[in-house]
Amino acid sequence: MAQIFVLGAGTPTPTPHRFGSAFAVHVGGEYLMFDCGPAATHKLVKAGIFPTQVDYLFFTHHHFDHDVDYPCFLLCRWDQSVGKENTLQVFGPTLTETLTERIIGEQGAFAHDWKARVNHPLSQRVFVNRGGTLPRKPPHVLAKDVGPGPVHRGREWAVNAAPAEHVQPYLDSLAYRLDSAEGSIVFTGDTQPCRSVVDLARGADMMLCMCWDDQERMQANGEAPGQCGTTGAAQMAQEAGVKKLVLVHIGPHLSTHGPMEKGIGDVRRLYSGEIIFADE
């Protein structure tokens, strides 16, 4: 099975143990990231992966808890490079290209940073000492807005996408399936239970699925539309025939003892496979 790192298993609400969404996968000798939420770059390094090792990033959607660390990741990966690394390729729904340009473009929010590092003698010396060769090149990223269907194929893997039902029409959302000889993994992103994600996940070895809260509580407080809770995640996984269900995007209420144990029990009643309540 491909190696999976849960960097962010939380929500927009920070807790001591979870905050935002971000995942890394080591497959076929390559590192991929899915989403880049709060502190994802730091969490990546804590997991033993340096930013320059990641060559592919896939965004499910552009809520801040899934992309707020994107500027940090882009700048850190570029700053720590020596110019011999592979070009970073970034895929995501509408706004992915625009956000990338707004961050590191010639008139981007952080253009002042990379221009100083490209041109100042001190930054040039640090770059050369690291192993780089002058002149130093500005950041270059291949960002692409994508939709449902085939997204990209690596050396030994392929990623396909399907629509996820979250907060349309304000933001487009995608779920991703990663297939390789090492197994099949689905990242639902943020979604309510829906046919498109079930079909994408059909027969997968693992599904990392949003699980915001106890489903009954969500129905009672009006937070069910656009989101998966406990039984929603379980029903999708069971219908898709997923072998292992990893619960992520876990809200603060469900993270507490009592609701956590009840939630896992509710999932177990509907889903017959292995259940993992994710930690970062």
Segments (PLM) and residue ranges:
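Cap/insert and terminal regions of metallo-dependent hydrolase folds
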Residues: 173-175, 181-186, 191-280
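Binuclear metal-dependent hydrolase catalytic cores
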Residues: 1-185, 264-280
